[in-house]
Amino acid sequence: IPIIRPLNSSLTADEIDEITGILNGTTNYMLSKMFYEGADYDTVLKEAQANGYAERNPEADVEGYDACRKIAILSSLISGQQVDFEDIYCEGITKITVEDMKYAKAMGTTIKLLASSRRYAGNRLHAIVAPCMLYPEHPLYNVNDVFNAIFVHGNVLGDCLLYTSDAA
């Protein structure tokens, strides 16, 4: 998603206080298949690899490390301070089961791997990467398949959603 240039140029007068996104198309593809088709993790991983979405060693994607590195970069940009990805809590999708997806559906939610960074008073920052349950009202709820999206909130911008496919 082309977000770095806007953060460095178009949005420099804006104080960005939140960036939340689906930053990895591979994991979003896998979770979409699990949710809509009822497929299990191992099956969708093999399918993602066969389609060229997942690497032979998918650890960086499925453990959330790729999304974690990306949110660390974005966190650094919005805060003006160095954010090390190793300081961010990171949980991937390897423990998500078919049963989890059934419960999410029963509750009227879906499960997405979100990377989120939020600024608080005093330029304090909180960032996390983890599977989250989203209700249909959430702007990232309908981002499926290999698509990525970033929700940005700023004091001048308000809410903005950037959306693209990016898993190949």
Per-segment meaning from a language model:
Residues 44-142, 147-149:
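Substrate-binding/catalytic subdomain of NAD(P)-dependent oxidoreductase enzymes
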Residues 151-162:
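An anion-binding loop in the catalytic cleft
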Residues 163-168:
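Conserved small/polar residues in nucleotide/adenosyl-binding loops
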